[in-house]
Amino acid sequence: MYKKIKLRDQQISELINLESKRQNSQIELIASENYASEDVILANGTSLSNKYGEGYPGKRYYGGCTFIDQIEKIAIERVKKLFKIEYANVQPYSGSSANAAVFAALLKPGDKILGLDLNAGGHLSHGYKINFSGMFYSGISYFLDENELLDYEAIEKIALKTKPNLIICGYSAYSRKIDFARFRQIADKVNAFLLADIAHIAGLIAAGQHPSPVGYAHIITSTTQKTLRGPRGGLILTSSKEIAAKIDKVVFPGIQGGPFFHTIAAKAVAFKEALEPWFKEYCAQIVKNAAHFASEFIKKGIRIVSQGTENHLFTIDVLSSYNLNGKQAQILLESVNIITNKNTIPNDTLSPFVTSGLRLGTPAMTSRGFKEQEFSQMAEIIDFVLRKKELNALEIKEIKKKVKILTKNFPIKKSYWP
């Protein structure tokens, strides 16, 4: 496929090759990024891209759907087995699309959504004003306590006072485990639906490295590209036949047209991989690496939000630790081929475009084979760069050399994990 692109569109071909080289030559520490396997990438770039077919298996509005029906059925059965749940919709184009479908299925315009404050680790699609979820629904926030942990009693008080129609748990920058059972207790007290958005931790849940929301959340949404190592896409899970029927009607014809069958095939491949024994080892290593990585910074006196991690990510308070904002830290590290992202922290005083924090994650480099030793090296390099603030040409050259050795020893195409 890429060869044909090169022959017919040299400009795009060159940019694809440059991006591939960039990924291979840089250390990827963005918590929401990962490396899909060759099988997933191959499945995502097939003749399935040519096929259109609205509806669901056996109930399409177009002919010629024999094989795509089988593919979608396989994807559904695999993800149901993976999460031990009764119903699944694998058609959502993204995690935000999945959330939009849930809101449309269960809520009326103006209904109340209770989610974690964005600065504290929530997500735009959890009721934030500039997002559709805050435009069509009334977003209410809960917050972390003084130790930067979920305060379930405080959340319950807010819920009892505001009477939300939907409560969301599941985050983009929260490094501790979530008590889904406690959230369900809160939801039941106010007769609210409970949505678990597990976009970041889906792989960890499937591998038994984080408690599962199945049996507690009325409905579950996720992306497929993060810790699941699949293609970019979304999914919706539920144990309720009634909710499943509502979701199916909203996904199509409610908010989407024809599914991306090439992506559904790639999802199916990723789900199969996640059912393999090695995937549990991989996710266990993600968690070990993150805990070790965070502890290395803590030893150096660096402030980590909530003082550690129990999943795949953590956030450094770079403003108090290095007298840098998140944007400055991100740019500094990218200058030596280490890719991170600026991130807000609880009670952040800086704008989301600047931030006081820097979020770090271990899934991508764990995919390439990094273990505790390599993450110790990364902590040393990152700490040095952020303390120096201004690197001279020789220092930049030396650090880039260290990064090059690591990326060469742990290439993407020879990932430690199948």
From Swiss-Prot:
Keyword Transcription (UniProt): no
Show the PROSITE patterns listed in the entry. SHMT (PS00096)
**How is this protein annotated for GO cellular component?**
cytosol
Query: For (6S)-5,6,7,8-tetrahydrofolate, which residues are the binding ones?
Result: 118, 122-124, 351-353
Matching entries from InterPro entries are given as: PyrdxlP-dep_Trfase, PyrdxlP-dep_Trfase_major, PyrdxlP-dep_Trfase_small, Ser_HO-MeTrfase, Ser_HO-MeTrfase-like, Ser_HO-MeTrfase_PLP_BS, SHMT-like_dom
Which SUPFAM superfamilies is this protein grouped with? PLP-dependent transferases
Extract the GO molecular function terms from the UniProt entry.
glycine hydroxymethyltransferase activity; pyridoxal phosphate binding
EC numbers: 2.1.2.1
Q: Which cofactor does it need?
A: pyridoxal 5'-phosphate
Q: Which UniProt keywords apply?
A: Cytoplasm, One-carbon metabolism, Pyridoxal phosphate, Transferase
CDD domains under this entry? SHMT
Q: Which reaction does it catalyse?
A: (6R)-5,10-methylene-5,6,7,8-tetrahydrofolate + glycine + H2O = (6S)-5,6,7,8-tetrahydrofolate + L-serine
Pathway membership: One-carbon metabolism; tetrahydrofolate interconversion
The subcellular location is: Cytoplasm
Q: What residues bear N6-(pyridoxal phosphate)lysine in this entry?
A: 226
Which proteins does it associate with, and in what oligomeric form?
Homodimer.
Report the PANTHER family cross-referenced here.
Answer: SERINE HYDROXYMETHYLTRANSFERASE, SERINE HYDROXYMETHYLTRANSFERASE 1
Question: What is the role of the protein in this entry?
Answer: Catalyzes the reversible interconversion of serine and glycine with tetrahydrofolate (THF) serving as the one-carbon carrier. This reaction serves as the major source of one-carbon groups required for the biosynthesis of purines, thymidylate, methionine, and other important biomolecules.
Which family, according to UniProt?
Belongs to the SHMT family.
Please give the name of this protein: Probable serine hydroxymethyltransferase
Q: Which organism is it from?
A: Mesomycoplasma hyopneumoniae (strain 7448) (Mycoplasma hyopneumoniae)
